Curated annotation (Swiss-Prot):
SUPFAM superfamilies: alpha/beta-Hydrolases, Galactose-binding domain-like, X-Prolyl dipeptidyl aminopeptidase PepX, N-terminal domain. It comes from the Bacteria. Homodimer. InterPro entries: AB_hydrolase_fold (IPR029058), Galactose-bd-like_sf (IPR008979), Pept_S15_Xpro (IPR008252), PepX_N_dom (IPR015251), PepX_N_dom_sf (IPR036313), Xaa-Pro-like_dom (IPR000383), Xaa-Pro_dipept_C (IPR013736). It catalyses: Hydrolyzes Xaa-Pro-|- bonds to release unblocked, N-terminal dipeptides from substrates including Ala-Pro-|-p-nitroanilide and (sequentially) Tyr-Pro-|-Phe-Pro-|-Gly-Pro-|-Ile. GO terms for biological process: proteolysis. Belongs to the peptidase S15 family. This is Xaa-Pro dipeptidyl-peptidase. It comes from Streptococcus macedonicus. One of its GO terms (molecular function) is aminopeptidase activity. The lineage of its organism: Bacteria, Bacillati, Bacillota, Bacilli, Lactobacillales.
Length: 763
């Protein structure tokens, strides 16, 4: 384990003393260091009547147990303090460490003890993580250090788990949205599942906008999947025009109805454990699936601002600006009198996407978004550079396939009976508008692009994203992060995993950082918390995170690709084509080792490079026909230690998100030897070689010169490493599988690779 602590706020000694005493620690700044430490340790073991026993089981050094030390005249030294602290954090002498000083350096221990400043050190110790992934204080509170009294308590600017999760209110309301997506003449009602503590305090809300949470129709999804095999279409040359327009909601007038309570309860809804963490700390949790989902009205519009508006209406209800009913009868209103009106949205993938989209509406009350692996433009999810481009791992999926998956109203037989015929007409229209035949950008996709609306964002934006996420690719966070106005507070956590959550990783205090941030933004704590703009997981060493100023450097290094001309044959023998089509992972494996139809270039790295941004290929290419796909990948090639892209479980159920509540596993990305690591990749329709909105003819056998910008990344290369550049046509994971006979020729002498370099490293 290594410490990467971003959540700690240094406090004046008077405030630290006050906060420690409020928790029951008999410590003052006038006490001798040794006595203060003994009082602290005995309080730690509050569940023991005889605290001598647990002290007897710890050591002060490798020759003396802790009880003996406290009963002796020996002075407290830094080495003894650190040895005791490590044990309180779960590190075991003779198992985890045999030399305290060496181990402190190895784990980058964040606490600096100085004689006469024991109180500050103990204050810091309480909010430092144990080996189990919980802070020492969170662990103590989960065991009953202070009462669970449904009131707010804070330490180091963080809300503590003092809200009772054994006796929660679970209720359902139906919010009226300014939509009629199914055109039945009534405004669509949106089902809202609410979980909140029983308290007199007005609560801020953690809201997860999840089209999945009311069920998914896997059967309909699988039937709708597209066949990937086919010929690449030749498109007529033209310029595409689109219009950015604001969504116009329908009028949703208030109605004079009696006010009552919810009439519907529930026992369980699939939780997001980060929400659970905040539930125990005085935040309501709400789960909303939006239009076209079971329990709600309307059709699934999939990614446009009508869908977003169905979630926005819920935030408006929490702020008294829209109404909710107690049932589908619409005869009694429910008021969110328990809510403060302040909202943080959470969730990964589609859930995080709706967080980003909601932020671009500028809705009042949305204070923070925590958008994880979020889409910023749906075109960039299902298309790329004029090509159909399936998200990684899901060949054959498209937006209308996702519509079928999430239109959970069809899982309710009554709704199916009444609405399916009309819904199928709606779905057919959606399938036509997404224009799978050409792969081009159009108004349908532009209406599902949140980037043109980034200027409306007011909320503090927190993003997490995997630089190995080939499902929601890194371009999504790169684009939205850099599109936000300078007035917006923004933060990004970039890791080397794939499409995964990171809140329960051992190496970074993400939960505590979010607690500190939300306690300031939504609970009125005057924290003056400074969270770095960008926090990046260093790929060159295990469990190391560092802060960077920006995502995307303007400094460039140029690498030559060669001096000759090389060809890429698009066509495969039938058996080989079928083998790759059957299992795209076989194709990827053979591509990386130079066995597929590809130009394979190994570039020796002569300097240390810290890549930050979008790698660009400057290419001179010709095609034997009037069409062509060009795909590219850039690998860090050669065996060395690298991160795996899926976290492993270190300790099952180690993390308690409250008081014996919503336990979850502690995880971390393994750092092991591997043959290669993809740094970036991309696909391009050569007819879109200039830009996305310009479709050009491809003159057969004539040279074309263009720039091919790949997915952004942040990655360290060391002198002596090898960059493997792969240029090929069909990508069996992502693109249409065209097996026609054409050849691409690349003039390497007139081509190069441009790498964005952080802080001039390598220039």
């Amino acid at each position: 384990m290594k410490y990467n602590q971003f959540s700690f706020i240094p406090r004046p000694i008077a405030i630290a003393e006050q906060e420690l005493q409020a928790l029951g620690f008999d410590i003052t700044h006038q006490q001798a260091d040794k006595k203060a430490l003994e009082n602290f340790c005995r309080k730690i073991f509050f569940n023991y009547k005889d605290t001598d026993y647990p002290l007897h089981q710890l050591i002060a050094d490798f020759e003396t147990d802790l009880l003996t030390f406290f009963n002796s005249e020996r002075p407290l030294t830094a080495d003894i303090f650190y040895t005791i602290s490590l044990q309180l954090l779960g590190f075991i002498p003779h198992v985890d460490f045999t030399n305290t000083t060496d181990f402190l350096e190895k784990i980058a221990f964040p606490i600096n003890y100085q004689k006469g400043h024991i109180l500050e050190a103990l204050y810091h110790l309480l909010v430092s993580r144990q080996k189990s992934g919980m802070t020492l204080l969170d662990d103590l509170i989960s065991k009953g250090l202070i009462p669970v009294d449904n009131n707010y308590h804070f330490f180091n600017g963080k809300s503590l788990a003092t809200f009772d999760t054994t006796d929660l209110i679970r209720e359902v309301v139906y919010v009226q949205s300014p939509l009629d997506t199914d055109q039945d003449g009534q405004l669509d009602l949106i089902k809202v599942n609410i979980i909140r503590p029983k308290t007199s305090h007005q609560l801020p809300t953690m809201m997860t906008a999840s089209p999945y949470h009311q069920g998914t129709n896997v059967v309909a999804n699988d039937k709708k999947l597209y066949k990937m095999e086919g010929d690449l279409a030749v498109k007529p040359a033209r310029t595409i025009n689109v219009e950015t327009r604001d969504f116009e909601p329908l009028a949703a007038p208030d109605v004079d109805l009696p006010i009552g309570e919810s009439e519907e309860r529930f026992n369980f809804i699939d939780p997001y454990t980060l929400n659970d963490y905040f539930l125990a700390r005085g935040f309501a949790n709400i789960y909303v699936s939006g239009v076209g989902t079971a329990g709600s009205d309307g059709f699934m519009t999939s990614g446009d601002y009508a869908q977003v508006e169905s979630f926005k209406a819920v935030i408006d209800w929490l702020n008294g600006k829209s109404i909710a009913f107690s049932s589908h009868r619409r005869d009694q209103k429910v008021v969110a009198d328990w809510a403060s009106g302040l909202v943080c949205t959470t969730g990964k993938s589609y859930l995080g996407t709706m967080s980003t989209a909601l932020a671009t509406t500028g809705v009042e009350g949305l204070k923070v978004i925590i958008a994880e692996s979020a889409i910023s433009s749906w075109y960039d999810y299902y298309r790329e550079n004029g090509l159909v481009c399936s998200p990684g791992g899901y060949p054959g999926e498209d937006l209308d396939v996702l519509t079928e998956l999430t239109y959970s109203r069809n899982l309710l037989p009554g709704d199916y009976l009444r609405n399916n015929a009309h819904y199928q007409e709606f779905l057919d229209e959606q399938s036509a508008q997404l224009d799978r035949a050409s792969g081009d950008y159009n108004q349908f996709w532009h209406d599902r692009n949140y980037l043109p609306h980034a200027d409306k964002v007011k909320a503090t934006c927190v993003f997490t994203h995997g630089l190995q996420d080939w499902n929601v690719k890194p371009r999504h966070i790169f684009n939205i992060f850099n599109a936000l106005p300078d007035t917006v507070e923004k933060h990004a956590f970039l890791h080397h995993g794939e499409h995964v959550y990171m809140h329960n990783w051992q190496s970074i205090d993400f939960r505590e950082s979010m607690n500190t941030l939300l306690s300031e933004k939504m609970l009125g704590q005057d924290n003056h918390f400074v969270l770095p703009t960008l926090i990046w997981q260093d790929n060159s060493q295990e469990q190391a995170w560092t802060s960077l100023a920006e995502f995307g450097s303007s400094n460039q290094a140029t690498l030559a690709l060669g001096t000759d001309q090389k060809i890429i044959d698009n066509h495969y023998a039938k058996a080989e084509f079928e083998r790759y089509s059957k299992n795209f992972r076989t194709f990827k494996s053979e591509l990386f080792t130079g066995k597929a139809n590809a130009i394979c270039l190994d570039l020796p790295i002569k300097n240390d490079y810290h890549i930050n941004g979008q790698i660009t290929l400057h290419l001179t290419v010709k095609s034997s026909e009037n069409k062509g796909i060009l795909s590219a990948q850039v690998l860090d090639y050669g065996e060395k230690k690298r991160f795996k892209d899926v976290p492993s479980v270190l300790d099952l159920y180690a993390i308690d998100n409250g008081c014996n509540f919503s336990r979850e596993a502690l995880k971390e990305l393994p750092f092991t030897k591997a043959k290669e690591r993809v740094i970036t990749k991309g696909v391009l329709n050569l007819q879109n070689r200039t830009d996305l909105l310009t479709i050009e003819d491809i003159p057969a056998n004539e040279w074309m010169t263009f720039d091919f910008t790949l997915q952004p990344s942040i990655y360290k290369l060391e002198k002596g490493d090898t960059l493997r550049v792969l240029l090929y046509t069909t990508d069996f994971e992502h693109t249409i599988r065209d097996n026609s006979n054409y050849i691409l020729t690349v003039d390497l002498d007139k081509s190069n690779l441009e790498i964005p370099i952080e802080n001039n490293v390598g220039l």
